[in-house]
A protein has these predicted regions:
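Metal-cofactor-binding active-site regions of metalloenzymes
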Residues: 23-468
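Bacterial N-terminal signal peptides
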Residues: 7-17
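Positively charged n-region of N-terminal signal peptides that target proteins for export
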Residues: 1-5
């Protein structure tokens, strides 16, 4: 029997023995203990439970494959008959099939869904690793992502709000690649000040303004779909939505710096963009080779834009993926000390950092939140039970929030992550409640918005606990 369960039982016994009804939070905790072995009751409990927010969320990875098939049909695109990826027309009917066939051909539809996600993944000679299949899925649906932001936002915001989330930070590229195209004609120089000046003069302001307009259009389309302001308003109208500017770290260094600069500029100009983040697989060649340079870039830009928040994918590496020296390279520590990360996503290789106890102590002291993506860690990285880092961070008092990462590709949601915490790591009700509170406490919003979100979360918990 776990220590939290013993303490809970003693607390309830003392309370009842004194003739006093247990407090609402105690009743909710007791209910979780009662239903943890009853899947149908546990899921209902966790679905209704307030979860705060999702701080690690990739927009394109959060949309389900069925939606991407719909976009491909709407756009007149094709399906590659061998890879089942969405490709450009014309469709020849043999090597490439009209996407409309995925609406009527059940077998084809299921092949496409499996290609655009990790559903039904089984290793094969041409597709032998779930992690590689996971990243390949993004290429398979990439063609239809930029033209459907309103629908995509509507899908993920509704899903979050329907699970009793009140806040979402999602990662995207607001300028839709305009900055990457701009940087293609700019030569690299180690003089970051000169490079910044060149990029600003090359049209960065236009790209940033275009990014804000893209968000305007997408949000207006989302609100229209939600019928916000009417009696038929969708539950998603009440969710607070913010964005992280994602930087593709596997690109050439001039492109990476240009994206970083655009992210800092946009966060300064548009309050909806609250942070920048580096994305793409961390074992990509440029991501590994240029990691120290990327941190220096962030350090340089942080000094110019000190009020812009930074959260970084860090330590998303596991033994066997890379040489041991890369695991020992203290990517997590460097992301915090040099890259100025206030939050860390994943943090899987913490035990391999040199002097890991000191790094963990530093994270606890500085209140560096770890965005723990339980589902992707377990299913994509095969890190379960003792191999998972969640207990390590909890044991060392590092703040944690649970996040979905790419719920569309992994076919999951935030409720699933909370359920995994309960079933796989014996998380009790106070721990789950702390996860939810941390997601608001460490959210990158202004003080007034944070106070409002915290008050709303308190009220949501009061209503939830009063139901038991």
């Amino acid at each position: 029997v776990s220590v939290p369960r013993i303490l809970l039982a003693l607390a309830l016994a003392c309370t009842l023995g004194a003739g006093v009804a247990p407090a609402p939070a105690q009743r909710a905790a007791a209910e979780l203990q009662r239903v943890r072995s009853r899947p149908e009751l546990l899921h209902d409990f966790l679905l209704r439970m307030p979860k705060g927010g999702d701080l690690h969320h990739h927009l394109t990875g959060a949309v389900y494959a069925e939606s991407y098939i719909g976009y491909a049909i709407e756009d007149g695109d094709c399906i590659d008959a061998s890879t089942f990826a969405i490709v450009a027309p014309p469709c020849d009917g043999k090597a490439t099939l009209p996407a409309t066939q995925a609406a009527s051909n059940f077998v084809l539809r299921n092949h496409v869904i499996d290609a655009l996600s990790i559903r039904n993944f089984h290793p094969s000679p041409l597709d032998e690793d779930v992690r590689l299949h996971f990243f390949a899925a993004f290429d398979a649906f990439d063609r239809v992502t930029n033209g459907h932001w309103a629908e995509m936002l509507a899908e993920v915001v509704h899903r979050a709000a329907a699970q009793n989330e009140i806040y979402l930070e999602t990662m995207l590229t607001p300028d839709q690649g305009e900055v990457i195209r701009l940087a293609a004609g700019v030569p690299w120089t180690n003089d970051l000040g000169a490079l910044r000046a060149t990029l600003l003069a090359a049209g960065m302001a236009k790209a940033v303004a275009d990014g804000s307009r893209n968000l305007d259009v997408a949000e207006a389309g989302m609100r229209q779909r939600f019928a916000c302001g009417t009696r038929a308003a969708d539950v998603g109208c009440g969710l607070t939505l913010r964005y992280q500017y994602q930087v593709l770290r596997a690109f050439p260094r001039v492109s990476v710096f240009a994206q970083m600069l655009a992210g800092f500029e946009m966060a300064r100009a548009d309050r909806r963009v609250v942070a920048i983040n580096l994305v793409q697989s961390q074992d990509e060649y440029n991501a590994l080779a240029d990691f120290p340079l990327h941190m220096r870039m962030l350090d340089y830009l942080h000094r110019i834009y000190p009020d812009v928040h930074i959260t970084l994918h860090a330590g998303e590496l596991t033994p066997g993926e890379v040489k041991p020296e890369e695991l020992w390279a203290n990517h997590i520590e460097q992301s915090i000390d040099v890259g100025h990360a206030e939050r860390v996503g994943h943090g899987l290789d913490i035990v391999y950092e040199r002097n890991a106890p000191a790094v963990l102590a530093m994270m606890a002291r500085k209140h560096i939140l770890v965005e723990d993506c339980l589902y992707s860690h377990e299913v994509v990285r095969d890190m379960r039970g003792r191999d998972n880092v969640l207990p390590i961070y909890l044991r060392n008092h590092v703040p944690i929030s649970l996040a979905t990462d790419d719920e569309g590709v992994t076919r999951s949601d935030l409720t699933d992550s909370f359920e995994r915490a309960v079933l796989g790591y014996s998380a009790d009700y106070p721990t789950l409640k702390t996860f939810a509170r941390n997601s608001i406490r460490y959210a990158f919003v202004d003080a007034q918005t944070k106070r409002a979100l915290e008050a709303r979360l308190d009220a949501d918990f009061a209503r939830f606990e009063a139901s038991f």
